[in-house]
Amino acid sequence: MKIALSGKSGCGNTTVSSMIAKHYGLEFINYTFHDIARERNIPFSEFYEKEIIGRDDYYWDMYLDKRLSLLSKKNNTVLASRLAIWISKSADLKIYLYAKMEVRAERIMTREGGMYSDVLSSTFNRDENDKKRYLSIYNIDIDDYSSKTDLVIDVTNINSNEVFELIRDEIDKRNLKN
């Protein structure tokens, strides 16, 4: 079984994907810019500003997405990334998590700290930068996800356990097996 899960920052992609992987005994694949920043011993905000937004060649985007594309070919996996539903062509189930920006900003603030107004502004800016980069690099509009997914879940008013249950029900309904 292969599952691809996408959504913008603060939607619970990582949390829910890891729950799915653990429940079904699947490999959890979630390699992000945060991981690259940690590997380089650079704070994420600095890495994002200098290496993602500050470069014109999209090197790190292509590095990350190539690695995820290779990993997405493995069986018995849950791939969680912004572009998972586009990258994982052979996924048995493609899921997109959606939440209002204000809710995502609150969740990010709870996870990472900071002032709400700053987190809201940086969340908006990151969304806009991601959209521009993915359009430029891959001609992918990350706001046009409905035709690429099997299941869209609005997570604005539900917690990760409820999201997991909805996904588990869909997996069972489709009779997907590990």
Curated annotation (Swiss-Prot):
Keywords: ATP-binding, Cytoplasm, Kinase, Nucleotide-binding, Transferase. It holds the Pfam family Cytidylate_kin2. InterPro entries: Cyt_kin_arch, Cytidylate_kinase_dom, P-loop_NTPase. GO terms for cellular component: cytoplasm. Disulfide bonds: none annotated. GO terms for biological process: pyrimidine nucleotide metabolic process. This is Cytidylate kinase 2. ATP binds at residues 7-15. NCBIfam families: cyt_kin_arch. The gene is cmk2. It comes from Borrelia garinii subsp. bavariensis (strain ATCC BAA-2496 / DSM 23469 / PBi) (Borreliella bavariensis). GO terms for molecular function: ATP binding; CMP kinase activity; dCMP kinase activity. It catalyses: CMP + ATP = CDP + ADP; dCMP + ATP = dCDP + ADP. Belongs to the cytidylate kinase family. Type 2 subfamily. It is found in: Cytoplasm. Its EC number is 2.7.4.25. It comes from the Bacteria.
